[in-house]
Amino acid sequence: TQGTPEKLANELAKCKDMTDKPFGVNLTFLPSLTPPDYPGLIKVIIEGGVKIVETAGRSPAEYMPALKDAGIKVIHKCTSVRHSLKAQSVGCDAISVDGFECGGHPGEDDIPNFILLPRAADELEIPFVASGGMADARSLVAAMALGAEGMNMGTRFIATEEAPVHENVKKAIVNASELDTRLIMRSLTNTERVLANPAVDRLMEKEKALGDKLTFSDIVDEVAGVYPTIMMDGDMDAGAW
C-alpha cells in the first residue's frame, strides 16, 4: 500500500482519520529490481508527522540523520546479535529481534528466538522487542521471560478482519500448520520463509536442479511482482509468499 511517496501519503491520511494514537511506518531496504524512492518516502514520513519508523533489511545508517533530525524514533529489525549491535551503534533507538521462526526473511544464521532473545538481552543496551512466530498472549509472556520488552507481530495481523488482503490469504494462514512453510533462496543468501504452494514447489525444483549455478533470473517468475496478485486477487499459486 505504500510503494510510492504518493501512496504512502494517502495511507498516512487514512491512519490519521482512523486514530489519534501514535502509529509507525515500516521502511524495508531489500534488493529490488526497481528500488522504491526511499528519500521521497522519508520526506513524506517527516512531513506527515510520523514519529516512529521501523526499518528492516539493509542498514538504515544512510537515512538516520534525516530521521533523527526530525525527532523520529527508529526501530531496526535484526536477525542476529551482531546486526543488532551495529544498529545500536548507528543510533537506532530500539531493535526488533527477529528469530528464525519468522515468516519472510529470517537471515542466514538460523538462530531461533529461544537462543537469540537471551543473547540480545545480554548484549544490547537499548530496548528490544521479539519478532518471529509471535501470535498471542503466550508469545508475549515467553518473549518477556527471555528478556524482550515486548513483541512484534507480522503475519498474525494479515489474518485479521481489518487487513486489506484477500480472504483466500487469510484462510491459508489460519489453516496452515508448523509443517507448511518452506525456506527458499538459501543459495542466493536471501533466505525467505514462505508458505508451501505449487509455485514454491517449482522454485525449489529449480534450486535443486541448478544448485550453486542458480541465479535470481532463474526464479524471477516465482518471486518478482507476485504479491499484488496473491494478496489482492487471492491467486494463491501465483508465486512464493
Spans of model-derived segments:
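Conserved active-site-proximal phosphate/metal-binding subdomains
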Residues: 107-129, 135-241
